[in-house]
Amino acid sequence: MAIRTGFCNPFLTQASGIKYNPRTGRGSNREFLHSYKTTMSSFQFLAPKCLDEDVPMEERKGVHVGTLSRPPKVYCNGKEVPILDFRCSSPWPRRVNIWGEIDFRGDKFDPRFNTFHVYDIVETTEAASNGDVSRFATATRPLGTVITLLGMSRCGKRVAVHVYGICQYFYINKAEVDTACGIRSCSELSVLLAECLRSSMITQNDATLNGDKNAFHGTSFKSASPESFRVEVIERTDVYYYDTQPCAFYRVYSPSSKFTNYLCDNFHPELKKYEGRVDATTRFLMDNPGFVSFGWYQLKPGVDGERVRVRPASRQLTLSDVEIDCMSDNLQAIPNDDSWPDYKLLCFDIECKSGGSNELAFPDATHLEDLVIQISCLLYSIPRQSLEHILLFSLGSCDLPQRYVQEMKDAGLPEPTVLEFDSEFELLIAFMTLVKQYAPEFATGYNIVNFDWAFIMEKLNSIYSLKLDGYGSINRGGLFKIWDVGKSGFQRRSKVKINGLISLDMYAIATEKLKLSSYKLDSVAREALNESKRDLPYKDIPGYYASGPNTRGIIGEYCIQDSALVGKLFFKYLPHLELSAVARLARITLTKAIYDGQQVRIYTCLLGLASSRGFILPDGGYPATFEYKDVIPDVGDVEEEMDEDESVSPTGTSSGRNVGYKGARVFDPDTGFYIDPVVVLDFASLYPSIIQAHNLCFTTLTLNFETVKRLNPSDYATFTVGGKRLFFVRSNVRESLLGVLLKDWLAMRKAIRARIPGSSSDEAVLLDKQQAAIKVVCNSVYGFTGVAQGFLPCLYVAATVTTIGRQMLLSTRDYIHNNWAAFERFITAFPDIESSVLSQKAYEVKVIYGDTDSVFIRFKGVGVEGIAKIGEKMAHIISTALFCPPIKLECEKTFIKLLLITKKKYIGVIYGGKVLMKGVDLVRKNNCQFINDYARKLVELLLYDDTVSRAAAEASCVSIAEWNRRAMPSGMAGFGRIIADAHRQITSPKLDINKFVMTAELSRPPSAYINRRLAHLTVYYKLVMRQGQIPNVRERIPYVIVAPTDEVEADAKSVALLRGDPLQNTAGKRCGEAKRKLIISDLAEDPIHVTSHGLSLNIDYYFSHLIGTASVTFKALFGNDTKLTERLLKRFIPETRVVNVKMLNRLQAAGFVCIHAPRWDNKMNTEAEITEEEQSHQIMRRVFCIPKAILHQS
């Protein structure tokens, strides 16, 4: 590495031309309030004092705070380079040729291009200048919304295509408006709309629109005139209900989204508005057939031959190579081209360090002294999947280990470029300048949405007062924002929206694609890539950082390797392909596809289809008060796992998904263990097929019998849902819009899947992502109608779907029992099965469970080979007899052994030997390895040991009452041996503590928890107390439960004081002593501390936890009674006693003799006969050997 010269420490030297002014507060330079920076003469200086290598060690604590009067600079390869001066050679790659007011493209630059690819769309508002008479000015006077398509031309130019003339519009019922306003014509309505806008100056003089203080308001509203609007009368039909008749609506066109949004909220709020919240981007895509949100376009002359206009550099909105102005008729989408231009990916990771009195505290971006010390940036070409550049931004000098540099070279990777900075601000402004000048289209990292982006944005905003609105693609007034959007699955989630920079967080992708006990990057890399990282404990970072450039290089290596692993994960899972396919299908932007949920995907598709059929969509729909307690939407098989720090209110609703009805019960399972074959028949795409088969939709529903009684009975269907009669007309009367969408999507998916076998490997990957995207959207249709606070709720439709689904399962059960219960009828229907009959006398068929879209059918007296062969025929017979296409049953699997635990929970071995589980996690991320291992051993024994299987099947037939006087079946002895072995292991003096470590996620900062008396938070506070390595938010905290001792109790008291809730004393039972009441979470401890201090584990807790876990899984063997199961499993535990040594000595001195505990007869699986002497021993032990209280799991 080149020797750096001129590294500036303003606290030690006064370099020529540099003036340093110490300060204690934030910088107040108003220059920081501008958009992206091209010049800067001074800035706030924050740097750790540990970088002052020429001062005594005792003076290297804390952070320097002041203002430095010079332009920000970077050191690279021994040279000093101004960060913001574009004329100087850059230490990072640049893709822009315009910087500030200067155009560096040169005279020979050719702006022409014909085809271009779009990856993001941005809406802006323009006000035309008085002297501009172009057609583009006409579209923006007084205000106009402009749609900017961001992308890249086929010839490699980065382009921004500004589309003018896109009008938002909304509908309002003409009769209602005329009555409310006393008008009759479109011109009168235009006058009232303009007056409404102008009057906003009186009540909203200083108000902002949509939270944007830079938005056009005030004077722009004052200039609104009737000519600002185009109003027409058009006949349309409300999409809700079949009996809704077409009527006249005013359709109000507005050139500005600001006007539209204000009017929909404030112009006669009591009047229902239709499609007022449909933004200009959606109108652009919907009103122009074939237009896509992600894909290729070509330029063409307009309808009357109008051509596009190239913007000069002085008028560019972005730093693209070329910007043009056009109208929508200058564009034509290019279908069936799935190729990608050379888009770039930024993969980054930040390292932070607390600079306060406790350097191991959790960094907080609002704390001035908590600093970003390094940022690694890996730059990739997305279509080539190649790593092109490696950059390391370092606060202070940094020398990467030569070993690591050589490893990179040997692997054929780019040599890392190390960029060194005097202050944190220079590091951050350099990183933001890289983002602006390199202008990657995509960014990724690990937990960047919740931490990296959030920390950088907060630091620049709150500490340095630097606005980021110019650091996306838009040069000023753009969107560069991150915000919290509530809770999902009891975890906080955020979203980031940056104009022109699509952020894909691989943490979110990993949690979706993988099922792991820990989602740390190392764990994910091991599982997905079979790679591991060189770990650097957080507690070591301050020491490494302060020790000089060589050890800072170790931190840099750690930082770079994290980004490298994330880059590999990105190109393994290719999330950009699937999400771009969703965006294209749903005709929404890629950012919306990532962050805005399922509702918007269906809404936009429905909007386009409804418009083509003459329907309009009311804003917010018509929220029903409909209550139906027998059904709920079942949106998937994923069972969300509750975070242990939250509880669910039985009546409250969350800020997220609000369902207006509940229930989903079909019929309860016959729980138990089955060793007879069990066939599972599944409905293919149950809810979508129900919607199609029964023509369910907003448009086909009526609540009024008078509406349908004039129709033929075959032209409508009647369903009784929650005591209410609902009527849906058949497709020959009116076709369901939801059904049409599903039919088209499923046909598209089928066609795509048919292309995969004959495609190249690269094309096959892309096609597979496209078909998966269609499946995701199809499965969202049902849930779209069932969310009470959704875009367009219709709980009647959602409840009808689940009601029909339940009826289908019941009718399937009845058909099987009525037609195949008799052996003769069964053989007649399936003559090929006769050779597999084991016993005609033992023959029995019974449906033992109906699970939303599946039926479980048990056959006795017939071999599994024969049953497996007739499964598909069975499904076909039932489908043909009972259901309308496209509803059909399929034979998915046949179990040879099945443990049916409860609804949606079962474990079994399917024909062929594969184990299948649903709703049961043998390896739970909240359990320790000891419990997971033994739970797995018990399940494997049950499923693969035929002796145990037969005994378990026998046990599951025994009634609960009988177990009080009945011995366990002898075949269960194997179960007993495993449980006894677990007990021996946990009571052994040589325990491997790693097998007893549990983890829980720190889902938010500890101060944000309502209940802080949690196991993982206890460990967090103990680490703070001991100045240990502090976990980051969303990291999982490891802990073990220790035995209660005086030391543990003292630590619990200290933790209670630290978190602000001291333990309450309660009166003791002996001698009036006061004892603190400890709960399990108070006994949580850091595993490293336990090992180093020789603390004992809480044996009783762990074994009780094992028994409890096993009881939840195996309660189906014992009448589904968890408490009974615990008692029965504890029969296998050898009796042991913990003897107080002091008491034993006293007893022996008094003449007592030590005798053995009752013997266990393993052969008979019972206790041997207890002698009179042994009985006396038990009595004496209870009297004299009083053990200390041991906590049990609640």
Curated annotation (Swiss-Prot):
One of its GO terms (molecular function) is nucleotide binding. GO terms for cellular component: host cell nucleus. One of its GO terms (biological process) is DNA-templated DNA replication. Keywords: DNA replication, DNA-binding, DNA-directed DNA polymerase, Endonuclease, Host nucleus, Hydrolase, Multifunctional enzyme, Nuclease, Nucleotidyltransferase, Transferase, Viral DNA replication. It catalyses: DNA(n) + a 2'-deoxyribonucleoside 5'-triphosphate = DNA(n+1) + diphosphate; Endonucleolytic cleavage to 5'-phosphomonoester. Gene3D superfamilies: DNA polymerase family B, C-terminal domain, DNA Polymerase, chain B, domain 1, Helix hairpin bin, Palm domain of DNA polymerase, Ribonuclease H-like superfamily/Ribonuclease H. It holds the Pfam family DNA_pol_B. It is found in: Host nucleus. Its EC number is 2.7.7.7, 3.1.26.4. The keyword 4Fe-4S does not apply. InterPro entries: DNA-dir_DNA_pol_B, DNA-dir_DNA_pol_B_CS, DNA-dir_DNA_pol_B_exonuc, DNA-dir_DNA_pol_B_multi_dom, DNA/RNA_pol_sf, DNA_pol_B_thumb, DNA_pol_palm_dom_sf, DNA_pol_type-B. It comes from the Viruses. The keyword Nucleotidyltransferase applies. Forms a complex with the ssDNA-binding protein, the DNA polymerase processivity factor, and the alkaline exonuclease. Interacts with the helicase-primase complex composed of the primase, the helicase and the primase-associated factor; this interaction may coordinate leading and lagging strand DNA synthesis at the replication fork. Belongs to the DNA polymerase type-B family. PANTHER family: DNA POLYMERASE CATALYTIC SUBUNIT, DNA POLYMERASE DELTA CATALYTIC SUBUNIT. Replicates viral genomic DNA. The replication complex is composed of six viral proteins: the DNA polymerase, processivity factor, primase, primase-associated factor, helicase, and ssDNA-binding protein. Additionally, the polymerase contains an intrinsic ribonuclease H (RNase H) activity that specifically degrades RNA/DNA heteroduplexes or duplex DNA substrates in the 5' to 3' direction. Therefore, it can catalyze the excision of the RNA primers that initiate the synthesis of Okazaki fragments at a replication fork during viral DNA replication. This is DNA polymerase catalytic subunit. It comes from Varicella-zoster virus (strain Oka vaccine).
